[in-house]
């Protein structure tokens, strides 16, 4: 699929919809999808930190794990990550380790802070 054929807004809305799934399951409002170079969703995830008692179970990490499992590789070169909120430093680095090509997000770190998430300390260090 040619890059200009990918509907970024539509994919962002899918990630936002997963953030609603996360809220409905009793977790934080963060969702994520990963598409391959053909525009096919190969991974998705939502925040499971509270549900799994796992501080690394952010939506992006869950989507990366899901995508890697689905394609049978840790290398997501050429893939695009869409997330409901700007990735925290941990998630951003996980995406870099996975060779994610591009990242798009609906809300930024300041929006997250405005609803009570304490990510600033990780950006300021």
Segment roles from a protein language model:
Residues 2-5, 53:
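Active-site oxyanion-binding pockets that recognize sulfate/phosphate
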Residues 4-25:
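Short, basic/aromatic recognition patches
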Residues 13, 43-125:
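Zn2+-dependent cytidine deaminase-like catalytic core
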Residues 26-27, 99:
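Glycine-centered short loops/turns at secondary-structure junctions
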Residues 30-36:
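Short beta-strand scaffold segments in enzyme catalytic cores
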Residues 38-42:
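Short, glycine-anchored, charge-dense loop/turn motifs used at functional sites
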């Amino acid at each position: 699929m040619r890059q200009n054929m990918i509907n970024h807004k539509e994919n962002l809305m899918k990630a936002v919809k997963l953030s609603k799934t996360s809220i409905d399951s009793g977790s934080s409002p963060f969702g994520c999808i990963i598409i391959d170079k053909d525009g096919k969703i190969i991974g998705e995830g939502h925040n499971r930190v509270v549900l799994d008692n796992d501080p690394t179970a952010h939506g992006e990490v869950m989507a990366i794990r899901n995508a890697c499992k689905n394609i049978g590789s840790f290398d997501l070169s050429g893939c695009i990550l869409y997330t409901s909120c700007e990735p925290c430093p941990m998630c951003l680095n996980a995406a870099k380790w996975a060779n994610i090509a591009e990242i798009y997000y609906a809300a930024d770190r300041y929006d997250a802070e405005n609803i009570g998430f304490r990510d600033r300390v990780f950006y300021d260090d």
